[in-house]
Amino acid sequence: MLQMGKAREPNFLILFFFGLILAFGISSEGSQIRHYKWEVEYMFWAPDCNENIVMGINGQFPGPTIRANAGDTVVVELINKLHTEGVVIHWHGILQRGTPWADGTASISQCAINPGETFFYNFTVDNPGTFFYHGHLGMQRSAGLYGSLIVDPPQGKKEPFHYDGEINLLLSDWWHQSIHKQEVGLSSKPIRWIGEPQTILLNGRGQFDCSIAAKYDSNLEPCKLKGSEPCAPYIFHVMPKKTYRIRIASTTALAALNFAIGNHPLLVVEADGNYVQPFYTSDIDIYSGESYSVLITTDQNPSENYWVSVGTRGRHPNTPPGLTLLNYLPNSVSKLPTSPPPETPAWDDFDRSKNFTYRITAAMGSPKPPVKSNRRIFLLNTQNVINGYVKWAINDVSLALPPTPYLGAMKFNLLHAFDQNPPPEVFPEDYDIDTPPTNEKTKIGNGVYQFKIGEIVDVILQNANMMKENLSEIHPWHLHGHDFWVLGYGDGKFTAEEESSLNLKNPPLRNTVVIFPYGWTAIRFVADNPGVWAFHCHIEPHLHMGMGVVFAEGVEKVGRIPTKALACGGTAKSLINNP
């Protein structure tokens, strides 16, 4: 009897401690479970001092910041309170190893969450870094559905650089026209382009019809703000003689941006959640989908405040710079700097943009890429007309997502859910990237590039002339489910001669990369994350117009997928027939 009682005691203790783990959200390895309950809904807001409708979370715009340590589990209970729209949220830069269904891409990883429904996102944040989240259905990111996601090192570990304080900055662009009107315009004959944004927002705040720097330009209307308005500048409060880390992420729908602080050099230390070899610069270019950490030292005249300026690059500017203050405490925020804000470099100075981008290399000790790849895919970016509609296409295929999510369709072998013929992996060698496209074979499609697990893949992104003469645009491309090595950039068409210029020594790891006008960008990644993953231009209207592809790898190895992720299209029928 006594022996039996002793045998049961450890089991009771195990259950007791397991209960504590659940109650306090602490895993057995010291990581935590961080639970959030979010309600997504439209609400009236005035991001740039003009009232409009934004998509917010729990009454906040931008949405709440998620903060966790590497190794933590994040659980987001998402309730869709939109009246007539579905919703999903993509966790930008989070690899979703083991949870591809939680990537938050409608028609790829999951079904859209219907109005009134609740969906639980449950995933592990593996790596420290500066990330963010955003809507990934239609153009909901442009409507304001985004927020910050910051991952600190695991408990007991430190960053490889010192700083005394931290400032988190989320950059976005804002239109007064609704996303629904924008979507209809983009899908019309003839196309109605969305135009340039009205305002650049810093942490969801900007000024459309006034300027906080009006004293330097008599043509500008001064702002008369008390500081409590939703459009009042988000002030960077700092103490003199300290080092601050500024985490910067761009959720813009269209704009490429330039960030600068008057009189303060920026030390770049992180890009897309990966450490880089530190380097100083006066300003940084940041494209949609990218994130950076920069360090600044507050060693300037402590009796002054300094301008923080965010201007547009890469497109002919029709949007004033977003402004705020670096406020040296205890100075009053009403004390404006003695000089004008930093001037944004010329919008079309692409050499300057390239020089900044080329300086980004991996920090010492970072993982190196495999020496050779098993497979190489060339992706030609072109603008085309299909049945009178203006579309973007990759290798003459404009992506239109199917009603059944790829992940479920491939998991349950639903062969009719999407085109079983893979898209082209090359484009014609004689294609002239310097002239407008004339190929009449461009089509709408939804085929998939499939990889074997462990396959080492090179992707060559090739830019080209648009339909208008002498015009080629910057495109930032984002890959879900992976980081990749950026092996190189170049002007013109990629050829075999470019092979020797590829960087295999210290290429940076990124999840978003830019291709410059009339140029190419080469990346390499390992297909080691079972799932189905989007790879697309992060400019919202370009993706809406078909500028993306879909990668799949090892779907047969994917574990159980939550039923709610598949409750639409052909997978819904499978669930009904096979409960």
From Swiss-Prot:
SUPFAM superfamilies, sorted: Cupredoxins
List of residues binding Cu cation 4: 475, 537, 542, 547
Intrachain disulfide bonds: 49-231, 111-568, 210-223
EC assignment: 1.10.3.3
UniProt xrefs under InterPro entries: Cu-oxidase-like_N (IPR011707), Cu-oxidase_2nd (IPR001117), Cu-oxidase_C (IPR011706), Cu-oxidase_fam (IPR045087), Cu_oxidase_CS (IPR033138), Cu_oxidase_Cu_BS (IPR002355), Cupredoxin (IPR008972), CuRO_1_AAO (IPR034259)
Record PROSITE patterns: MULTICOPPER_OXIDASE1, MULTICOPPER_OXIDASE2
Residue ranges of domain Plastocyanin-like in the record: 33-152, 164-330, 374-553
UniProt keyword annotations, A-Z: Copper, Disulfide bond, Glycoprotein, Metal-binding, Oxidoreductase, Repeat, Secreted, Signal
The keyword Nucleotidyltransferase is assigned to this record: no
Any Pfam family: Cu-oxidase
A Gene Ontology term for the protein's cellular component: extracellular region
Cofactor(s) listed: Cu cation
GO molecular function, one term: copper ion binding
Subcellular location: Secreted
Superkingdom of the organism of origin: Eukaryota
Signal peptide: 1-30
Chief site of localization: secreted
Residues that coordinate or bind Cu cation 1: 90, 478
Catalytic reactions of this protein: 4 L-ascorbate + O2 = 4 monodehydro-L-ascorbate radical + 2 H2O
Statement: the UniProt record of this protein carries the keyword Glycoprotein: yes
Amino acids binding Cu cation 3: 136, 480, 536
Residues engaged in binding Cu cation 2: 92, 134, 538
Residues listed as glycosylation sites in the UniProt record: 122, 355, 470
Assembly information from the UniProt record: Dimer.
Entry's family note: Belongs to the multicopper oxidase family.
Protein name: L-ascorbate oxidase
